[in-house]
Amino acid sequence: MAWLGSLDLHYRPDPDAPAAALPRTIGRGVHSGPLRVLQSLYPEGPGICHHVLVHPPGGIVGGDELALTAQVDTGAHALLTTPGATRFYRSGGDAALQTLTARVADGARLEWLPLETLVHDGARARNALRFELAPGAEMLGWDLLALGLPAAGERYASGCFEQSIEVRSAAHPLPWLERGVLDFDDPRHAPVTQRLLASPLGWAGHTVLATLWFASGTALASARRDALIDAARAPDSAAQPGAEPLGVTAPHDHVVVLRMLGARVEPLMQRLRAVRGRWRRLAWDCAGAEPRVWRT
């Protein structure tokens, strides 16, 4: 049986907060089906609402459709994460669909920090992320995509997986669009997919792709962009082997992007967490605090 689920989230400052106090970010959610918020947490104080998103069935299979929307109002700061990996399982026919549409208002902040996405062999799925930033809005997000289960001898060699990451702003319609298709189902596309995964211009034989980005609804000053790039390139004494960035760029003056490839999730995730902490301190003067659920 396919699961149909939706979750609509809304974050706003508490209108009843004392004028001299840091406004509390209130997070509310309305859900249908299995997708829901575990609870609202405030480990950094009242101004930043941490939400842990859960999907009790534990994975996404053919025919499932999950839709998440988030609205972050002016003055609010929301951090969204998950307690475990998002898994797209093998499908016997129908494709699965997961979508996120987030709108961030002027003066609001959003952090989109889910744990890794695992795409099993034979999965047929589409994962679409869209972020709409008003002038003055800012966000920090990441995506860690892992193909198959190499440690268990499972290669991703069949199925079709499509993913898109889209950042829009009122100042510029499309500062950044990332779209990738890995299609083994169509015999016309399968050879192209094989070359993409093997080529040094593509995945270079790796099975894990990590992406971290900082984006603004207003063009970032060149000094600020350069500082974010330098912070991402800084050596990390605690980094595990295979976790060095392959590229840190500003493809548009609204966004800075870090990219890594690797054979395992853990070293890349460790590096993402380290750079995310640096960017958070640099851009927002916030401590590099991490959600507690990552330590469980």
Curated annotation (Swiss-Prot):
Asked whether the keyword Cytoplasm is assigned, the reply is yes
GO MF: nickel cation binding
Location comes to: Cytoplasm
The answer to whether UniProt assigns keyword Calcium to this entry is no
Q: What is a single Pfam family found in this protein's UniProt entry?
A: UreD
Q: What is its main location?
A: cytoplasm
Which cysteines pair up through disulfides? They are none
Q: What are the entry keywords?
A: Chaperone, Cytoplasm, Nickel insertion
Q: Which GO terms describe its cellular component?
A: cytoplasm
HAMAP family this protein is in?
Answer: UreD (MF_01384)
Fetch the PANTHER family from UniProt: UREASE ACCESSORY PROTEIN D (PTHR33643:SF1)
Quaternary organization: UreD, UreF and UreG form a complex that acts as a GTP-hydrolysis-dependent molecular chaperone, activating the urease apoprotein by helping to assemble the nickel containing metallocenter of UreC. The UreE protein probably delivers the nickel.
Q: What does this protein do?
A: Required for maturation of urease via the functional incorporation of the urease nickel metallocenter.
Q: Which family does it belong to?
A: Belongs to the UreD family.
Q: What is the name of the protein in this document?
A: Urease accessory protein UreD
Q: Which organism is it from?
A: Methylibium petroleiphilum (strain ATCC BAA-1232 / LMG 22953 / PM1)
The record lists the lineage as: Bacteria, Pseudomonadati, Pseudomonadota, Betaproteobacteria, Burkholderiales
